[in-house]
Amino acid sequence: MKYKFDYDINESGMLILKGLAFRNRYVEVPREDRFRKLYSYILIDIDLSYALEFLVRGINMYDDIDRICYFQMAVIKYSKCYSPSKKDGRSQLSATKVYKGIEEDPIGCHNKFIEMRNKYFAHDENDFKASKLGAILNIDERKMMGIAYPQMQAKFDYFETIAILMKLCEITKNWIGEELDKEIECVRLYVEQRGFDKLNGYKDLKISNTWGLV
């Protein structure tokens, strides 16, 4: 079972849990390969939460540029959940498992979004293939006056497409929620066997900001 706690982060990056009726420490359990699925599901759940928030904001945007930005970010976040990672990265989801028994061809829609991410957003394969070059001709003087290219890129019916992606995100998030509950319980039982004294010997859990260019 998942619980949510309020917390503060002190100057050293240590997390301080709030609102508990007992003295507590929040200790960091050393990483193990057997926790990989749990780490992966946690990250996927976070990505899906962001994707859904981006989609909601995209629907409420009046400006096309803002809507496109939120939509593209949502597609990229969703696709990450199903995309293979490097050797030591997160475990990817299987669309076949997640959408098993769901009607209305969710896997077909899912594949379209993965293709959209790969060919339009992360790369420009389709836009490159669709790029056109034109020559402007002066018919009367029978000569070319210059070269021009239309500034066009792929467009989508954003409102309908957002609704479809939102449904896929919700289905995936529900599936992840159930799997997270199972995985958390397995990990809890495994870690609890170590006993209080061993666990109390672990370091306080700290977080650090890993973003940045330096």
Where in this protein do the model-derived segments appear?
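Amphipathic alpha-helical interface segments
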Residues: 1-112, 127-136, 142-214
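Long, charged low-complexity segments
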Residues: 118-122
